[in-house]
From Swiss-Prot:
SS bond partners: 28-75, 38-52, 53-98, 73-112
Summary of the function given for this chain in its UniProt record: Plant non-specific lipid-transfer proteins transfer phospholipids as well as galactolipids across membranes. May play a role in wax or cutin deposition in the cell walls of expanding epidermal cells and certain secretory tissues.
Signal peptide (residue range): 1-25
InterPro entries: Bifun_inhib/LTP/seed_sf (IPR036312), Bifunc_inhib/LTP/seed_store (IPR016140), Plant_nsLTP (IPR000528)
Keywords attached to this entry: Disulfide bond, Lipid-binding, Signal, Transport
PROSITE patterns in alphabetical order: PLANT_LTP (PS00597)
Entry superkingdom: Eukaryota
Homology family: Belongs to the plant LTP family.
GO molecular function per UniProt: lipid binding
Listed SUPFAM superfamilies: Bifunctional inhibitor/lipid-transfer protein/seed storage 2S albumin
Stated name of the protein: Non-specific lipid-transfer protein
Length: 116
């Protein structure tokens, strides 16, 4: 679990360094922070912690614009690439378990430029 968190944090830092910074724009740091309580569920399933759904709903509320949603998508791709232990079925069921719809399937090769 510690190595997964370290991988995610490295991806988040890389995304923050290489992405444009806007005052109101969502960042990979925000995406990572929102998903940290979800890592156990994403890897192993089981009950979704309330803190996880709070983070997921917070990210959904923060990603109001198309650029924000595309950035969040890119961050999710980076998290998937860095963490091979994440179960894609768990990742794709998470939004629904938290009562939201993100409008796309989470995959390692999603074209985030098509997210609107």
């Amino acid at each position: 679990m510690a190595s997964m968190v370290m991988n995610v944090l490295c991806v988040a830092v890389a995304c923050m360094v290489f992405s444009a910074s806007y005052a109101d724009a969502i960042s990979c740091g925000q995406v990572t922070s929102g998903l940290v309580p979800c890592f156990g569920y994403l890897a192993a399933g089981g009950p979704v912690p309330p803190a996880c759904c709070n983070g997921v709903r917070g990210l959904n509320n923060a990603a109001k614009t198309t650029p924000d949603r595309q950035t969040a998508c890119g961050c999710l791709k980076g998290i998937l690439a860095a963490n091979t232990r994440i179960n894609l079925n768990n990742a794709n069921s998470l939004p629904g378990k938290c009562g939201i719809s993100i409008g796309y399937k989470i995959t390692p090769n999603i074209d985030c430029s098509k997210i609107h």
